[in-house]
């Protein structure tokens, strides 16, 4: 009933957990209480699919991600996660999970939080580091499955991109890397909107 109330209020997506296991699932920062989704969490994912609410797997444990990918009949999102191949943090997605998310039509948004961008020098993480994460996803699965999730309200901000007023620098860097205007527009929101639109389609 709460999902339905959220939906009526205009909630477009829900993150399944934060920095700890809950009644739905295991968190990347938790103790692995459920081994992924709980039985109730499976019910919630199924109902979110039914009513057309996007599922956000940022903060989720690997086992939770895997359960969601297997269970969800709609594309999912990781609203603020980066690439584990470039920054070995449990909050980031490894290459196999990035591929799985993309194969389902989903999108991951690179998080501009230093600890998820540069493992060795989180306080010195730069805009260039973040651009490398974006390019890594593009090399793996193409430009239609990556976006940007600043997390400015959760500690985000990098050298060269500390606030919304500096985010134009990301566009300039992507142009310098040779990305097209259309690809950059998709990275800035088009990809996310595509997944949002997919929630309105009838389930197969």
What are these regions (language model features)?
Residues 1-111, 115-118, 131, 135-138, ...:
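Extended, charged catalytic domains and RNA/DNA-binding interfaces, predominantly
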Residues 39, 124, 128, 161-165:
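Soluble non-cytosolic domains of exported or imported proteins
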Residues 77, 147-148, 185-189:
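Beta-strand segments within the central parallel beta-sheet cores of soluble alpha/beta enzyme folds
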Residues 83, 154, 194:
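Active-site micro-motifs of SAM-dependent methyltransferase domains
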Residues 88-90, 121-123, 158-162:
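Short, solvent-exposed loop/turn segments at secondary-structure boundaries
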Residues 111-112, 141-164:
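Short acidic/histidine-rich active-site segments
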Residues 162-204:
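Mid-to-C-terminal alpha-helical segments outside catalytic/metal-binding sites
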């Amino acid at each position: 009933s709460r999902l339905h109330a959220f939906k009526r209020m205009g909630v477009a997506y829900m993150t399944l957990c934060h920095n700890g296991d809950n009644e739905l699932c295991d968190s990347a920062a938790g103790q692995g209480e459920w081994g992924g989704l709980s039985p109730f969490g499976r019910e919630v994912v199924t109902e979110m699919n039914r009513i057309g609410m996007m599922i956000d797997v940022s903060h989720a444990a690997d086992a939770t991600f895997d359960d969601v990918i297997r269970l969800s009949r709609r594309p999912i999102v990781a609203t603020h996660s980066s690439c584990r191949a470039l920054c070995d943090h449990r909050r980031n997605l490894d290459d196999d999970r990035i591929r799985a998310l993309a194969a389902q039509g989903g999108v991951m948004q690179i998080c501009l939080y230093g600890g998820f961008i540069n493992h060795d020098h989180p306080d010195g993480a730069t805009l260039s580091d973040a651009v490398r994460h974006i390019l890594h996803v593009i090399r793996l699965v193409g430009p239609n499955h990556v976006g940007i999730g600043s997390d400015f309200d959760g500690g985000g901000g990098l050298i060269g991109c500390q606030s919304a007023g500096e985010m134009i620098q990301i566009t300039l860097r992507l142009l310098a890397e040779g990305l097209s205007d259309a690809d950059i527009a998709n990275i800035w929101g088009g990809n996310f909107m595509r997944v949002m639109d997919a929630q309105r389609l009838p389930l197969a």
